Amino acid sequence: MEITTFDKLSKEDQALVKTAMEARENAYTPYSNHKVGSAVRTANGKIFPGCNVEIISLQTSCHAERNAVMNMAMHGERVIEALVCYGPYSGVPCAECRQVIWEFCDNNPNVRIIGATTEGEIELM
């Protein structure tokens, strides 16, 4: 894991982080108020946002990363090049989200994962 700053990211990664930041504004979190935004960039450069959506039964809630990947799939894309998770804490995806990411990474174990916090911390995984 590498710690960096927004300014040191490539223009493509900066655009991905900005999309995740915007997506976070649409998060539906009436129970935890833990808003998270995400964005995926496909192998051909398209970007798809996602945000977390809570349901009173938290087990049926959907994480931002999964929503971004499902948005990508809904638009006919199948290969993730990079993913950003943006929220108040470290952006390391949970095990379930990692499984969804793996399903759409074309067996590439080096998919770029960027964790960005509301405090400005950026982690590259």
Where are each of the predicted segments found?
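Short amphipathic alpha-helical face segments that pack within enzyme cores
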Residues: H63, N67, E96-Q99
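Short, well-ordered amphipathic alpha-helical segments that serve as non-catalytic structural scaffolds
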Residues: T19-E22, A64-M72
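Compact, glycine-rich, soluble single-domain proteins
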Residues: C51-T60, A64-R66
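Short beta-strand scaffold segments in enzyme catalytic cores
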Residues: N33-T42
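C-terminal binding/interaction regions
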Residues: M1-N26, H75-M125
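Alpha-helix C-terminal capping segments
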Residues: R41, N71-E77
